[in-house]
């Protein structure tokens, strides 16, 4: 059984929210369950290893070497979405290069993975590649149903094709305060009708 030490958690590409990490690590098994970790990633132009080794590849290439698929599989986690950012439609900063979402079987599994030797063997590549990242623990919301008269792909002016496929829009929202969450539900309902 791997016992992570949240107080030792430190990375060069962001600030670990130790309070949140502690909550994840100590969630009672009866209250724990799947969690989706959304990763917003911004890369260094050139990989920068902490041990001083010279790297002749980009931060993105270093992150590709990190890709912890083995440790994820070992704990029962699975990547469910991975995409390079084509265009950042709103706000220029921070600039995100890639978005990834991983479904973990539990909060505890996410925290305990950080201490696994097979994960730690790869992590220096992430440290070298990332300029900045945000990792947010998320739980899916129930999507509003599509209206009965929603058009099919065949009925829209520019349907997706093999040469010009559909676009996935990732909309990350930061609330000013918790009292505004009801407004977000209203926005989501209206956006679903328009989309």
Where are these regions (language model features)?
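Conserved short beta-strand edge segments in small beta-sheet-based binding/regulatory domains
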Residues: 122-138
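Active-site-proximal segments of catalytic enzyme domains
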Residues: 100-103
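Short amphipathic alpha-helices within nucleic acid-binding modules
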Residues: 49, 105-124
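Short S/T/G/P-rich N-terminal loop/turn motif that feeds into the first structured element of a domain
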Residues: 1-97, 108-112, 136-195
């Amino acid at each position: 059984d791997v016992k992570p030490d949240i107080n030792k958690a430190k990375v060069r590409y962001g600030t670990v929210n130790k309070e949140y990490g502690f909550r994840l690590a100590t969630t009672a098994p009866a209250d724990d369950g799947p969690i989706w970790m959304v990763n917003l990633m911004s890369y260094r132009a050139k990989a920068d290893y902490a041990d001083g080794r010279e790297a002749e590849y980009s931060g993105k290439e270093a992150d590709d070497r990190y890709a912890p698929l083995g440790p994820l599989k070992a704990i029962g986690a699975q990547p469910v979405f991975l995409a390079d950012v084509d265009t950042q439609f709103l706000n220029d900063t921070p600039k995100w290069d890639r978005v990834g979402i991983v479904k973990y079987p539990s909060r505890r599994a996410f925290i305990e993975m950080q201490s696994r030797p097979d994960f730690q063997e790869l992590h220096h590549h992430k440290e070298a590649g990332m300029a900045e990242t945000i990792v947010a623990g998320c739980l899916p919301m129930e999507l509003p149903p599509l209206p009965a008269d929603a058009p099919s792909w065949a009925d829209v002016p520019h349907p997706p094709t093999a040469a010009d496929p559909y676009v996935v829009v990732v909309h990350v929202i930061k609330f000013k305060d918790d009292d505004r969450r009801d407004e977000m539900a209203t926005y989501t309902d209206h956006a679903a009708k328009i989309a």
